[in-house]
Curated annotation (Swiss-Prot):
Its main location: cytoplasm. Transmembrane segments: none annotated. This is Phosphopantetheine adenylyltransferase. It comes from Methanosarcina barkeri (strain Fusaro / DSM 804). The gene is coaD. Gene3D superfamilies: HUPs. One of its GO terms (biological process) is coenzyme A biosynthetic process. The keyword ATP-binding applies.
């Protein structure tokens, strides 16, 4: 049974995150998916990010909605970009264009340590309605919702009576 790793911050759990998680379970078949969730300490985003527990709860909610049994996955806290994937015997790592370079570096380090290389499964970005990738940053800026739908700009006028 394949052992699959996937990781991320998973802020504003959106359709791009869903695609990564779905691909991880598809590749794992009946094996186990190890999900690395970025710790609060590791974050340095240009926008505020919810705490670890809140992001973990969004992730768990989605996995439960998929109907995945508890024994098919494990969520671990990532305190560095690699997490357990440098040491443990994973078969696959699921990546987005953003995390692909990290997976390449991870395989170089694994090779230096004499470990089996991870098979990298590359998942393309999910595009918003405007053809630009869905991202947590765009959601934080109010440009799109979690499904990539454009938000209408509403102008507020102050009127004095």
């Amino acid at each position: 049974m394949p052992k699959v790793a996937v990781g991320g911050t998973f802020q504003y759990f959106h359709d791009g995150h869903a695609k990564l998680i779905e691909k991880a379970f598809e590749i794992a078949e009946d094996g186990k998916v190890h999900i690395g969730l970025t710790s609060d300490e590791m974050l340095s985003k240009s926008h505020s990010v919810d705490n670890y527990e809140k992001r973990r709860n969004w992730l768990l909610q989605y996995i439960k909605e998929m109907g995945i049994p508890d024994d098919r996955y494990e969520i671990t806290k990532l305190n560095d970009p690699y997490g357990p994937a440098l040491e443990e015997d994973f078969d696959y790592i699921i990546v987005s264009p953003e995390t692909y370079p990290v997976a390449l570096k991870m395989n170089r380090i694994r090779e230096e340590k004499g470990k089996k290389l991870l098979e990298i499964v590359y998942v393309e970005y999910v595009m918003a309605e405007d053809g630009i990738p869905i991202s947590s940053t765009r959601i934080a800026k109010g440009e799109i919702d979690r499904h990539g739908r454009l938000k209408k700009n509403i102008k507020h006028c102050n009127t004095k009576n």
